[in-house]
Amino acid sequence: MPEGRRLRRALAIALLALVAVTGLLMMAKEQQMGQEISPFDGHSNLALAQAVARGDTQGIHAQATQDRLRERGDRQVTLLQWAVLSQQPDSVQALLDLGADPAAAGLDGNSALHTAAMLQDAQYLRLLLAEGAQMNVRNAVTGATPLAAAVLAGREEQLRLLLAAGADTTLSDRLGDTPLHLAAKINRRTWRCCCCRPGPMPGRATSRASRSSFTSRKRRRICRMTN
């Protein structure tokens, strides 16, 4: 696939993901204002989801069972993603304490880590990383990592947090693009420099990834050019 088409497709996927996140953010805000709107309407864990959206940790513990924690809402959104989208850090922590999996695939194939990497507020990603979440988890549809989600969403702080936690810049998605490649294509100066850190060279899992991989010398050159 030509480079331009691959980039347009990656950006289109990122845009659709951001639209979905924005829609659920609005839904979460409406529910906090007392309107009966939830992606968990009609699900057995609706009361638990409502407690999550309110930040009601006592209600979360009272309602939580393993089956309810695993049950997904509309568009496969997980409760942990719902807590992040509802911007309720106490709910995020309560769900983590109860064993919710940050790496579980949910909304549009993304994990809660992907969702947290796309939001403006970085505290939710910090909470997940503090629990030892798997930072290189793949989107179930695209194969993209949370680091790629942060690059495409333009979240510099999340990018730095993931890199500091050891996120791999060389893991390609199903189109063969790595977070490092995406950062260079989008021409984000700061993020290209962030990606130019010592680390393993891109693997040779596919010939496409191998052909397009950056060398360490190229990484250093990009850093010098963007300083």
Swiss-Prot record:
<dbReference type="Pfam" id="PF12796">
    <property type="entry name" value="Ank_2"/>
</dbReference>
<keyword id="KW-0732">Signal</keyword>
<keyword id="KW-0677">Repeat</keyword>
<feature type="repeat" description="ANK 3">
    <location>
        <begin position="142"/>
        <end position="171"/>
    </location>
</feature>
<feature type="repeat" description="ANK 2">
    <location>
        <begin position="108"/>
        <end position="137"/>
    </location>
</feature>
<feature type="repeat" description="ANK 4">
    <location>
        <begin position="175"/>
        <end position="204"/>
    </location>
</feature>
<dbReference type="InterPro" id="IPR036770">
    <property type="entry name" value="Ankyrin_rpt-contain_sf"/>
</dbReference>
<feature type="signal peptide">
    <location>
        <begin position="1"/>
        <end position="35"/>
    </location>
</feature>
<keyword id="KW-0040">ANK repeat</keyword>
<protein>
    <recommendedName>
        <fullName>Protein PhlB</fullName>
    </recommendedName>
</protein>
<feature type="repeat" description="ANK 1">
    <location>
        <begin position="75"/>
        <end position="104"/>
    </location>
</feature>
<comment type="function">
    <text>Cell-protective protein that neutralizes the intracellular lysis capacity of phospholipase A1 through a direct interaction with the enzyme.</text>
</comment>
<dbReference type="InterPro" id="IPR002110">
    <property type="entry name" value="Ankyrin_rpt"/>
</dbReference>
